């Protein structure tokens, strides 16, 4: 079996096509949940640990993105407490981390939460989903069902993320998150979840904006800070959400 750039493109394209073929209904349901929270004056919190943090960066504080989206991460705890002695892997697996993040970000009943975890097994993400469930806050999960269904939960409840969330978007990635065999090795390469996540994130953004337009409302969309007038445009939008610590 050959391996190279062309194989990466073919494998990733296959994942994206599978996403479009199987997950657009779930993307629509998730976008509706998020839109309804925004209509009620809430914001959408987006959590991902490790590489899953990239999903939130696709939706929060960037050109073409909606303003009332807030990135939530393990790094918030590290920044507050200082990096010395902080182990992000341990934080990701500790259910108590979820309660610290909920408090830090002052999550409100009208908000929504997107939780991104390829494996769907770790304590922080699953406890975050459970705590949102307890508070009546809608949870959208972005996860690999194939991986999650072949892995044991690390949460005390024994539950995995897809078993808790209100809406589940399957990123269609395989167990282990890699696509391409390496000749002569058991290891594989071609990590897929970040590429799939970027497509899902941009799809959600577009679906939410479409709902604003259909409702004859102006969507609060950022533009690039590196075009003329970008700072002024974005500053005016951020001021609308300053009480929720939204930044660009």
PLM segments and residue spans:
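A short, well-structured juxtamembrane/interface segment
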Residues: 22-39
């Amino acid at each position: 079996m050959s391996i190279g750039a062309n194989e990466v493109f073919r494998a990733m394209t296959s994942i994206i096509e599978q996403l479009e073929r199987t997950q657009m209904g779930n993307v629509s349901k998730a976008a509706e949940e998020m839109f309804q929270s925004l209509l009620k004056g809430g914001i959408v919190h987006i959590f991902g640990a490790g590489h899953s943090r990239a999903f939130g960066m696709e939706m929060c504080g960037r050109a073409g993105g909606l303003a009332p989206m807030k990135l939530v991460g393990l790094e918030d705890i590290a920044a507050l407490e200082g990096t010395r002695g902080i182990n992000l892997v341990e934080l990701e697996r500790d259910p108590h981390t979820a309660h610290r993040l909920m408090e830090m970000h002052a999550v409100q009943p009208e908000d929504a939460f997107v939780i991104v975890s390829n494996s769907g097994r770790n304590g922080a993400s699953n406890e975050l989903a459970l705590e949102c469930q307890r508070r009546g806050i809608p949870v959208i999960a972005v996860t690999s069902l194939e991986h999650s269904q072949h892995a044991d939960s690390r949460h005390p409840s024994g539950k995995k993320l897809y078993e808790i969330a209100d809406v589940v978007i399957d990123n269609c990635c395989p167990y282990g998150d890699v696509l391409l065999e390496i000749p002569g090795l058991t290891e594989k390469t071609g990590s897929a979840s970040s590429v799939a996540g970027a497509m899902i994130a941009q799809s959600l953004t577009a679906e939410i904006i479409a709902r604003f337009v259909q409702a004859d409302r102006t969507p609060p969309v950022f533009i690039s800070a590196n075009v003329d007038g970008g700072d002024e445009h974005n500053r005016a939008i951020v001021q609308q959400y300053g009480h929720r610590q939204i930044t660009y």
